[in-house]
Structures are given as C-alpha cells and as structure tokens.
Amino acid sequence: MTSADYASRQRAIIAELNVAPHFDVDADIARRVDFLAQYLRSSGLRTYVLGISGGVDSSTAGRLAQLAVEQLRAGGYDARFIAMRLPNGVQNDEADAQRALAFVRADETFTVDVKPAADAMLASLVASGHAFETPAQQDFVHGNIKARERMIAQYAVAGARRGIVIGTDHAAESLMGFFTKFGDGGADVLPLAGLSKRRVRAVARALGGDELIVMKVPTADLEELRPLRPDEHAYGVTYDEIDDFLEGKTVSDTVYETVLRFYDGSRHKRALPYTLFDWPTA
C-alpha cells in the first residue's frame, strides 16, 4: 500500500470508531455520564451492572456509571449501580481490584468466582472426546470460556435486578479486536466507545483515579500458561502507537501494517451475526 492508501484507510477507521479529532476531558466526562443516565432512564430499567477487574477501563466505566445513577437519583429516578468482582479463583492482582472498587464507590458489590463453572465446562469438553491440538490452544480456549462465564454472571444479576450490562470496550480495543466475542465484548452499552487508551486514562485521572489505576499495565489475564501477559505483548505494538493511529497521527509502516492486520482479522467481532442477506452476491 502507498502512503496515501494508508492515510485513507486510517481516516475511514477513525470515522468508523467515532474517535473525535479534539478532546476536552471535562466536557467528555459530562457527556458520557449524561448519556448513561439518559440511556438507563429511557429503557425503563433501574440498574447498571459491570465487572470490575482492577484495570483502568473497568474502573473508569464503573465510576462513570456510579455518577450516572447518582445523577438519576438526584432527579427522582430510582437507579443503582452494581459492581461485580469476577475472579477466576484467586486473582493475581486482587489488590488492584480492591483499589478500583474503592475508587468506583458502587452502590452494591457482588463477588462471583467463575473458576468452578469455567473449569467444569473445560472438563466436559475433554470428557466428550474433544482433543486440543496443544496445551497452549487448550489454555487459550479455556481463557475465552472464563470471559464468557463472567458475562453470564453479569447478565444473571442484570436479569434479576432490572439491569443493563456495561461493557468496557474503547476505540483501541475495538481497533485491535482485543476482546472475547460474546465474552467481555457482549454488553448492552459501551460508555468508553470512541476513546483511545490515553484518553481513557485521562478520564480516569480527571475522575480522581489513583495513578496505580490510571497507569496499570493492561492485561486480559485469561491464560494460565502466561499469567498477567500484557496486551501489548499480544499486539506487537504499543498502546501509544495504537492511539497515535486513532488520533490521526503518522505512524511507521510497520505499525500501519500491524494495526490493519488486526483490524481486518477481527471484523467479525464488531458485526452482528451474518445472514445470507449480508453476503455479497456476484
């Protein structure tokens, strides 16, 4: 591809992911809190539900949600926010999760251990006769099972409490497809949509987040063979490079190629299920 081709695709992707050319953190916070408040009220439901991992994304989304329900209550609408801790057994960075909960200050907090359900599903697959090609493949699949079990738990609580499930996907993760389809990618509302990672951090900082939360190294921490593996190791590019791409800055050809490969390869994750009416005809 030529430089002009790269630039054209970059502009199209930025528009598709709704990344604004300019960013005012205080105005952005107010807009997102108001959006969450209006969305919940318009639905007729009463509760927001979100899993809090300890990372900056869930911490930021959680604090925005708590501010939104407080805004609704101030206006006479009964609304609550439920934060869920969803560890897989003992979480390696549990101290970070507790720090995040203290920052979010949710109305209620529930803890559900997904390990028994995730392990039981894997054991059932193995007992059925399914054979994984390698231990690494089994570990990867098991990790996605954990992510989906977490969403099952959140939707169970939402179903019982007239709730809506919040997702933490933002423009950087969406660009790279770095989420589990129907796992952490399965949610009702995405308050961080359109934000680069550095802008998520800016929002968290403006909301009063501890620097240990704001600058925590992002990790899905789903794979037991590679615990706490940083997202950037999986990407092969840094979040700063991803954010530069999203904010319309010039990046190296290697970064362009890497980003576009991830973006094109994860297109199915950003789409509704295909039907024959979506498939192009000759």
Curated annotation (Swiss-Prot):
<dbReference type="GO" id="GO:0008795">
    <property type="term" value="F:NAD+ synthase activity"/>
</dbReference>
<comment type="function">
    <text>Catalyzes the ATP-dependent amidation of deamido-NAD to form NAD. Uses ammonia as a nitrogen source.</text>
</comment>
<keyword id="KW-0067">ATP-binding</keyword>
<feature type="binding site">
    <location>
        <position position="219"/>
    </location>
    <ligand>
        <name>ATP</name>
    </ligand>
</feature>
<dbReference type="GO" id="GO:0004359">
    <property type="term" value="F:glutaminase activity"/>
</dbReference>
<dbReference type="InterPro" id="IPR022310">
    <property type="entry name" value="NAD/GMP_synthase"/>
</dbReference>
<comment type="pathway">
    <text>Cofactor biosynthesis; NAD(+) biosynthesis; NAD(+) from deamido-NAD(+) (ammonia route): step 1/1.</text>
</comment>
<keyword id="KW-0520">NAD</keyword>
<comment type="subunit">
    <text>Homodimer.</text>
</comment>
<feature type="binding site">
    <location>
        <begin position="268"/>
        <end position="269"/>
    </location>
    <ligand>
        <name>deamido-NAD(+)</name>
    </ligand>
</feature>
<dbReference type="Pfam" id="PF02540">
    <property type="entry name" value="NAD_synthase"/>
</dbReference>
<dbReference type="GO" id="GO:0003952">
    <property type="term" value="F:NAD+ synthase (glutamine-hydrolyzing) activity"/>
</dbReference>
<protein>
    <recommendedName>
        <fullName>NH(3)-dependent NAD(+) synthetase</fullName>
        <ecNumber>6.3.1.5</ecNumber>
    </recommendedName>
</protein>
<dbReference type="InterPro" id="IPR022926">
    <property type="entry name" value="NH(3)-dep_NAD(+)_synth"/>
</dbReference>
<dbReference type="InterPro" id="IPR014729">
    <property type="entry name" value="Rossmann-like_a/b/a_fold"/>
</dbReference>
<comment type="similarity">
    <text>Belongs to the NAD synthetase family.</text>
</comment>
<keyword id="KW-0479">Metal-binding</keyword>
<dbReference type="GO" id="GO:0005737">
    <property type="term" value="C:cytoplasm"/>
</dbReference>
<keyword id="KW-0460">Magnesium</keyword>
<feature type="binding site">
    <location>
        <position position="181"/>
    </location>
    <ligand>
        <name>deamido-NAD(+)</name>
    </ligand>
</feature>
<feature type="binding site">
    <location>
        <position position="168"/>
    </location>
    <ligand>
        <name>ATP</name>
    </ligand>
</feature>
<dbReference type="GO" id="GO:0009435">
    <property type="term" value="P:NAD biosynthetic process"/>
</dbReference>
<feature type="binding site">
    <location>
        <position position="57"/>
    </location>
    <ligand>
        <name>Mg(2+)</name>
    </ligand>
</feature>
<feature type="binding site">
    <location>
        <position position="188"/>
    </location>
    <ligand>
        <name>deamido-NAD(+)</name>
    </ligand>
</feature>
<dbReference type="GO" id="GO:0005524">
    <property type="term" value="F:ATP binding"/>
</dbReference>
<dbReference type="InterPro" id="IPR003694">
    <property type="entry name" value="NAD_synthase"/>
</dbReference>
<feature type="binding site">
    <location>
        <begin position="51"/>
        <end position="58"/>
    </location>
    <ligand>
        <name>ATP</name>
    </ligand>
</feature>
<feature type="binding site">
    <location>
        <position position="197"/>
    </location>
    <ligand>
        <name>ATP</name>
    </ligand>
</feature>
<feature type="binding site">
    <location>
        <position position="173"/>
    </location>
    <ligand>
        <name>Mg(2+)</name>
    </ligand>
</feature>
<feature type="binding site">
    <location>
        <position position="148"/>
    </location>
    <ligand>
        <name>deamido-NAD(+)</name>
    </ligand>
</feature>
<keyword id="KW-0436">Ligase</keyword>
<keyword id="KW-0547">Nucleotide-binding</keyword>
<dbReference type="GO" id="GO:0046872">
    <property type="term" value="F:metal ion binding"/>
</dbReference>
